[in-house]
Amino acid sequence: VIGGAECDINEHPSLALIYSTSMRFHCAGTLLNQEWVSFTMWDKDIMLIRTLCAGVLEGGKDTCLAHPCAQPLLPAFYTKVFDYIPWIK
């Protein structure tokens, strides 16, 4: 599923974001295949330290085209991978 529409097998991974404006932690899951999902949870205060925010807080502009992208107060975030190279290796 990409933006609510089906996609071809192995075309794109699917990312599901679970959040609440009142919660401190956010959770996301990436569908790896029919049997495996990779989940992550992060503290929204800490994630601001090593991330790049893409989009504007007013909404309407973001880096993706699928729903619910470009929503007010929910910009896209990208991780600075360089800081995690030792852990990745």
UniProtKB/Swiss-Prot annotation:
First-tier enzyme category under EC: hydrolase
Tissue expression: Expressed by the venom gland.
Active site, per annotation: 45 (charge relay system)
Protein name, as recorded: Snake venom serine protease rhinocerase
Misc. remarks from the entry: Negative results: does not have clotting activities. Does not stimulate platelet aggregation. Does not act on plasminogen.
One annotated GO biological process: proteolysis
Gene Ontology molecular-function annotations: serine-type peptidase activity; toxin activity
Keywords: Disulfide bond, Fibrinolytic toxin, Glycoprotein, Hemostasis impairing toxin, Hydrolase, Hypotensive agent, Protease, Secreted, Serine protease, Toxin
Disulfide bonds: 64-69
Post-translational modification: Glycosylated.
Domain of life: Eukaryota
Family as reported in the entry's similarity comment: Belongs to the peptidase S1 family. Snake venom subfamily.
Chief localisation class: secreted
Record note on temperature dependence: Optimum temperature is 37 degrees Celsius.
A cellular component annotation (GO) from this entry: extracellular region
EC numbers for this chain: 3.4.21.-
Location(s), subcellular: Secreted
Sequence ranges assigned to domain Peptidase S1 in this UniProt record: 1-89
pH effect on activity, per entry: Optimum pH is 7.4.
The species this protein was found in: Bitis rhinoceros
General function of this protein: Snake venom serine protease that cleaves fibrinogen alpha and beta chains (FGA and FGB), but not gamma chains. Exhibits fibrinolytic and kininogenolytic. Preferentially cleaves after Arg and Lys residues.
Activity regulation (UniProt): Inhibited by PMSF. Not inhibited by benzamidine.
